[in-house]
UniProtKB/Swiss-Prot annotation:
Cofactor(s) the protein needs: Zn(2+)
Co-factor remark: Binds 2 Zn(2+) ions per monomer.
UniProt keyword Phosphoprotein, yes or no: no
Protein name (database record): Chaperone protein DnaJ
Binding-site list for Zn(2+) 2: C166, C169, C188, C191
The record's note on its domains: The J domain is necessary and sufficient to stimulate DnaK ATPase activity. Zinc center 1 plays an important role in the autonomous, DnaK-independent chaperone activity of DnaJ. Zinc center 2 is essential for interaction with DnaK and for DnaJ activity.
Subunit structure: Homodimer.
Keywords for this protein: Chaperone, Cytoplasm, DNA replication, Metal-binding, Repeat, Stress response, Zinc, Zinc-finger
Taxonomic source organism: Mannheimia haemolytica (Pasteurella haemolytica)
Zinc finger (CR-type): 136-214
GO MF term list: ATP binding; heat shock protein binding; unfolded protein binding; zinc ion binding
Ranges where the J domain occurs: 5-70
SUPFAM superfamilies in alphabetical order: Chaperone J-domain (SSF46565), DnaJ/Hsp40 cysteine-rich domain (SSF57938), HSP40/DnaJ peptide-binding domain (SSF49493)
Protein purpose: Participates actively in the response to hyperosmotic and heat shock by preventing the aggregation of stress-denatured proteins and by disaggregating proteins, also in an autonomous, DnaK-independent fashion. Unfolded proteins bind initially to DnaJ; upon interaction with the DnaJ-bound protein, DnaK hydrolyzes its bound ATP, resulting in the formation of a stable complex. GrpE releases ADP from DnaK; ATP binding to DnaK triggers the release of the substrate protein, thus completing the reaction cycle.
Amino acid sequence: MAKKDYYEVLGLSKGASEKDIKRAYKRLAAKHHPDKNQGSKESEEKFKEITEAYDVLTDSEKKAMYDQYGHAAFEQGGAGAGGFGGFGGGGFGGFEDIFSEMFGGGFGGGGRRQRVVRGDDLRYDIEITLEEAVKGCKKDIRIHTLAECDTCHGTGAEAGSKVETCSHCHGSGRIRRQQGFFVTDAVCPSCHGTGKRIEKPCRSCHGDGRVHKAKNLSVTIPAGVDTGNQLRLSREGAAGENGAPAGDLYVVIPVKEHDIFERDGSNLYCEVPIIFTLAALGGEIEMPTLDGQLKLKFRQKLQPVNYSVLRGKGVTSPRGGYAGDLICKVVVETPVNLTEEQKALLRQFEESLEGQGKHRPKHEGFFDGVKKFFDNLGK
């Protein structure tokens, strides 16, 4: 089945900005996250799909390759975009050996050598709250991975057993045959690609040198991270084959939606409703911040929508530097569900304002303008 276009997966058109990509991912990740759709295979697959698209389109090198070649850029032998659980560590290995087969000696005279494959990169998602994202936190996680066998220490052999170079492939792990100008390449059937023959395979790992294990890790998440950010833990991925280095663990951060605040980059936004008497008379209200309540005094004559900017009460970048702002939208709330007595009081108050434009300057100015407009039409 053909893979969907990454831009289409995120509901974007080709050429979308990085900001649009992040916004689309944040919205879709929140909707399809497995924690919110437990037991739904469809949501799990959708989450994997949008995360893969996000990983490629926010990496400038991968995005450039995808824009030019499409999914073909990441197929076997290509650059590799990685998957949901393991990203793969194979790369471009094998070209030097093919040229060595054809022209004898290769580039640098390395000859055939045992295949060494770096361990797979792994991925782990940690969903955190906005408070944790802004202030930083530590999370303990448990991952399941391939680790070096404790019994044979990665050799794949029982103690005292001989480990010899495979005589069939001479340690390369591959069998290549030349037919004219064409070269065929396949995994060695004798050693199954390891490049070695073990007299007595280790009973714990059955000769692989690696075993499946659960591993506990403590992850430090820096202050200022946002949805889609990744942390790379070097050498915490799967163990490599034949003593090769382990892969890396990529911790991907989704941030939960907050009940009060919305985030855009380094700035936080919230909406604060106030009663109309406070807007008319002035007074003090409590503004929410991530550090607690902050009391602010309001002057008289607040209009229905006002903005109050609290400098430095936003988010600090993970790279350091200044903090963003908290931008509060102060909205005057119209009272509802009034009693007859309350309605009568409001009508009495309204009557007391009749003919006094100084109390309603915008109202008077607007209708004066309307009157002049129609007067001019009649001339």
